[in-house]
Curated annotation (Swiss-Prot):
GO CC terms, sorted: cytoplasm
Organism: Nostoc punctiforme (strain ATCC 29133 / PCC 73102)
Function in brief: Involved in peptide bond synthesis. Stimulates efficient translation and peptide-bond synthesis on native or reconstituted 70S ribosomes in vitro. Probably functions indirectly by altering the affinity of the ribosome for aminoacyl-tRNA, thus increasing their reactivity as acceptors for peptidyl transferase.
Name of protein: Elongation factor P
A Pfam family per the record: EFP_N
Localization terms from the record: Cytoplasm
Metabolic or biological pathway: Protein biosynthesis; polypeptide chain elongation
Family the entry assigns: Belongs to the elongation factor P family.
Length: 185
């Protein structure tokens, strides 16, 4: 059990049989009445976001999540096969279990698989990945009317905005959280 006074971003709690992660919290102490904690929660399974208010000091069950490092070995149909790096056991995850970050998933990449009991909740990819550009328009000298960036398609199918000097075939580092170009590799 965890008290609402101990909520911090990243803390996982159980509400109505689902795991929710605290995104934001605000401890409010009005001049009249009792204090309360206003939170913004994200459902780890579905990705939906809701706002919920708790009384100050109210206790809720805390979710104990297990993280294990697994390597993406191959894709079979609509399933992604991962291998546990310690036990060498294989596990299969669907596109919905991985979420929208699937566009950065590449064979041989290591990721943190998050489990709650026997249930797989999702996958945390590394903060940044290095991928090759398979298609982008050539950047013309003096063509900065569009803000100095252009779309580029990566080897995994993801599309990110890159500076004009980046060309097809180059390897770039991409922030998987913000969907942004970081640097050239």
């Amino acid at each position: 059990m965890i008290s609402s006074n101990d909520f911090r971003p990243g803390v996982s709690i159980v509400l109505d049989g689902s795991v929710w992660r605290v995104l934001e919290f605000l401890h409010v102490k009005p001049g009249k009445g009792s204090a309360f904690v206003r939170t913004k929660l994200k459902n780890v399974q579905s990705g939906s976001v809701m706002e919920k208010t708790f009384r100050a000091g109210e206790t809720v069950p805390q979710a104990t999540l297990e993280k294990s490092t697994m390597q993406h070995t191959y894709k079979e149909g609509d399933e992604f096969v991962f291998m546990d790096m310690e036990t060498y056991e294989e596990g299969r995850l669907t596109r919905t279990q991985i979420g929208d970050r699937v566009k950065y998933l590449k064979e041989g990449m290591e990721a943190e698989v998050i489990k709650w009991g026997d249930q797989v909740l999702g996958v945390e990819l590394p903060k940044s990945v290095v991928l090759e550009i398979v298609q982008t328009d050539p950047g013309l000298k003096g063509d900065t009317a569009t803000g100095g960036s252009k779309p580029a398609t990566l080897e995994t199918g993801a599309i990110v905005m890159v500076p004009l000097f980046i060309s097809q075939g180059e390897r770039i580092k991409v922030d998987t959280q913000e969907d942004k170009y970081i640097s050239r590799e």
